[in-house]
């Protein structure tokens, strides 16, 4: 499958950027987040599950089983698909170089802040 716009995130700010892009700019083709089980092994400040975005917008959501995107399910998913551009909001971890290399135009990250400035 070919995904043009992909958003990475695990927080309410991630939901906000998905909503903004989807409603104001262009369709979001995929959201990559972590499964709730990952939060039991990692400190995730302000975690918010994003699987509801499938129902809200019809956007597929991939839930990784590793915050570092190294689990077999996620590696296979990334290997079997093509990606154009990524937006990272509220991920709280470095995205590995092998994942960055999968995106034709790169992944662009934003740091959260108080008050959603």
Role assignments for model-derived ranges:
Residues 1-117:
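One-carbon transfer enzymes
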